[in-house]
UniProtKB/Swiss-Prot annotation:
GO CC field: cytoplasm; dendrite; spliceosomal complex
Record has Secreted as a keyword: no
Location in the cell: Cytoplasm
Any single GO BP term: RNA splicing
Pfam families the UniProt entry points to: Cript
Primary localisation category: cytoplasm
GO molecular function: microtubule binding
InterPro entries assigned: PDZ-binding_CRIPT
UniProt function note: As a component of the minor spliceosome, involved in the splicing of U12-type introns in pre-mRNAs.
Family statement: Belongs to the CRIPT family.
UniProt-recorded name of the protein: Cysteine-rich PDZ-binding protein
Record text on subunit structure and interactions: Component of the minor spliceosome, which splices U12-type introns.
Keyword terms, alphabetized: Cytoplasm, mRNA processing, mRNA splicing, Spliceosome
Amino acid sequence: MVCEKCERKLGTVITPDTWKDGARNTTESGGRKLNENKALTSKKARFDPYGKNKFAICRICKSSVHQPGSHYCQGCAYKKGICSMCGKKVLDTKNYKQTSV
């Protein structure tokens, strides 16, 4: 569960932009090479388990979080009704009986 404000912080998808003037993947701007696999050649998108961008642990259950920039795992965020990135209350779970099984 992610709130509307944190939804903008989520990463971009590895797909090319639409071909228009000023796009970052055109060959004229030097942004994209022909026949380049962006998933393999992008250094900032590559997973580095021992680097400084490793995944955090959940503040509630101490398990690893599978989304960069999040402080809570999806199970705890769903169970508590909070945003997994900032912890803001998204859903009122007072009368719900929720499980994260």
